Amino acid sequence: MSDYKNTLNLPETGFPMRGDLAKREPGMLQHWYEQDLYGIIRNAKQGKKSFILHDGPPYANGSIHIGHSVNKILKDIIIKSKGLSGYDSPYIPGWDCHGLPIELKVEQLIGKPGEKYSAAEFREQCRAYAAEQVAGQKADFIRLGVLGDWEHPYLTMDYGTEANIIRALARIVDNGHLMKGAKPVHWCPDCGSSLAEAEVEYYDKVSPSIDVRFAAVDKAQVLAKFGVSEAKGDVNVVIWTTTPWTLPANRAVALHPELEYQLVQVEGECLILAADLVESVMKRAGIDYWQVLGSCKGEALELLHFCHPFMNFDVPIIMGDHVTLDAGTGAVHTAPGHGPDDYVVGQKYGLEIANPVGSNGCYLPGTHPVLDGLFVFKANDIVIDLLKDSGALLHVEKLTHSYPCCWRHKSPIIFRATPQWFISMDRQGLRSQSLAEIDRIERQGLDEQNLSGWIPAWGKARIESMVANRPDWCISRQRTWGVPMAMLVHKETQELHPRTTELMEMVAKRVEQAGIQAWWDLDIRDLLGDEADQYEKVPDTLDVWFDSGSTSYSVVDARPEFNGHSPDMYLEGSDQHRGWFMSSLMISVAMKGKAPYRQVLTHGFTVDGQGRKMSKSVGNVVSPQQVMNKLGGDILRLWVASTDYTSEMAVSDEILKRSADAYRRIRNTARFLLANLNGFDPCKDMVKPEDMVVLDRWAVGCAKQAQDEIIAAYENYDFHEVVQRLMQFCSVEMGSFYLDIIKDRQYTAKADSVARRSCQTALYHIAEALVRWMAPILSFTADEVWGYLPGDRAQFVFTEEWYQGLFGLDAAEQMNDAFWAELLKVRGEVNRVIEQARNDKKVGGSLEAAITLYADEALATQLDSLQDELRFVLITSAARVQPLVQATADAVASELAGLKVGLGKADGSKCPRCWHYSTAIGQDAAHPQLCPRCVTNVAGQGEERKFA
């Protein structure tokens, strides 16, 4: 017999070498859908301890972008890893469906409500548009490999959810947190509505920067406060502002009570300025000569009166801690209707909350003859002319500064006092309770798993400062497409009906049946009878942040699959500290006195490879749809997992290419395992641990160590650590050591020998573990691998838990982990010498080499213990150990202390079956071409292996 190929155990598997993910994944998704994979998982996990990750609803408008993909993939990785850790972790995806962006889209399509279509018809169109957007986004999320109840997502426009949002507000009313007031709120003239904090973005804007004189009503009284009896000209307190248009609403000038102010004589007048800012004011006003006449603390000037620069009234000096020396003059123009700080200090002094600006951003009639009807930003120059005419303008220049803008229109917004409904931060202690909950979440996390409840830990300080400093929450909106506030107020007093919470429940029951339109269709006589004549509906809708912020109640508490469990985790982008995390915290504490979550995980924004924000104009946008169509969902998932999400997440074609390279290494490892498990039946062929070759037990132990570290990384949400450990296992421990060494034994040993079955047993255990490590991240590939693994098993890897069949070497054994770690280093040194010899054309491959290891006594003892099997570890045809002192001159010194490596050509000729060189080829007449080892493997009992 001259062709021995048929006697080899060559690797064989149907598992393809190429992932071809973009083509293969859609078919897998179809299979998952047809089999009801999500339902199978839920049944398998029934009765397990629960872990609830509550989905923050994306807005139902437009296609998903790379940031959406990051968010959904991170959630999916956590849900799947929790399943492997023995949790029942249902995932109900959701969408935010009401609000202005959808209104604006529908307006573009059919016009404003009340024009061609009634408000009721307009709402129906909004509902239909939102449903269409949900369908498009849902298809993309499913394509990412995200498992969830996609057949039954939650939508904030579901009738039941709309009703529960009203019930949430009723509970907050009942708990005494709601109040009405004319407070200044962010107002977008383009939207014609107030905006939430989270709907405000900041962009650079050029504004006029002006210093304005307010002249003292009683000059002598003011001079006396500075200890001055006389001075030349008027006495003027100087304010600085970048919003001249707000001056018609000025009702005071604020000073800091503790700051020192100076009375400064300049040509023809005296100016009152903060002492530390005198020089900077003089410099910008171009005043070269001045004299300080006197000084006093701000508090000395309290309630002195000064003339408004162009309106026919005077205003008081008031004290405010918000006054700083960061810029300006130390005196702050105060318009309580146009600024939160101004409003707060104005309340203290009982100032009028003047709001001369309409909802369209134009001055109301009766403001001022030259200003009435003008758009405020166009009025700045006219106000400056008024100041010039009255002699009140000290200085004007242009200033580029960061200015609040509407997130939708990107246009500058204003603060505008309008009658609105607010959740009070302090009336019932909501602020202090919320801050206490923020603390508790951190402590509870540290107590339970030594991991802060705020992940990363800096998230705590961020939300803490936001809650500590935030104003009362304006929850009312003047929109058409939104959940109604569903309250009734007395026509004369504007007080809420005394049975408000009871009436809101009656409305909620109607909304549950017919949606929010039921409120607008409702005749309040049906609720109040004869009393109806005294009451009217509150026409406002709720801020959409109230919709999404109340979902722990309106969705999680309501859905049966959550079994009454409250959410364990909220996970969103870092912008949500002031968005969903905050609104959810406020509502839950206002309703129940506790936070809605136990952990809050935040991820960074996506940027391009150079760290730049993605923008269509720059042309650096990475589309998740294109990535999936070109590379596949698993590559996108691997990029997400391998990137540290705690800061900005860089993505580009080059970065994704690196992810594809890493994917190939993992896939190749999985394929090698499957190909070499060909013909292995775990029921019949498994070798007991005590009978296995030592190296095989070491490999299983490596997998056990890797698994412990991988599970810990999953539990700490360190997914990039999972990927790094997975890569180290596949590339280093397996790829460049174990899998390399076992090829000879796996291919050439007798098919059913212990030597080969021991190796296959190790590969089987490793494959069972590896497929589970992969599953949360490389979900498509793990499912594919699962289908090729030998033995009876559940239909899907996603119903399983971490593999429990791993074991390792005993530390007391001679050939323990430390022994093999040392051998890894020795092999590395030998490989270096062989590589050099190949470059020098001394040998063609490692099997042409005979290696002599010159070792010190301790190392020699270790190496000798492998006996003749040392050569299999080194993958050479011969290997011997000699004392270090006998090292020849050509032996290569190594980086290992006590080792030199000698290399020569292997004696004998090459065996055509195993490719090892042997001097004993031809000793068996029946197989004259084979070495003795191959003869016993082909025709005898098969070789024995103990160590390698």
From Swiss-Prot:
CDD domains: Anticodon_Ia_Ile_BEm, IleRS_core
Keyword hit for DNA-binding: no
Cofactor annotation: Zn(2+)
Binding residues annotated for L-isoleucyl-5'-AMP, in chain numbering: E572
Short motif 'KMSKS' region, span: 613-617
Record keywords, A-Z: Aminoacyl-tRNA synthetase, ATP-binding, Cytoplasm, Ligase, Metal-binding, Nucleotide-binding, Protein biosynthesis, Zinc
NCBIfam families: ileS (TIGR00392)
Name of the protein: Isoleucine--tRNA ligase
Organism from which the protein derives: Edwardsiella ictaluri (strain 93-146)
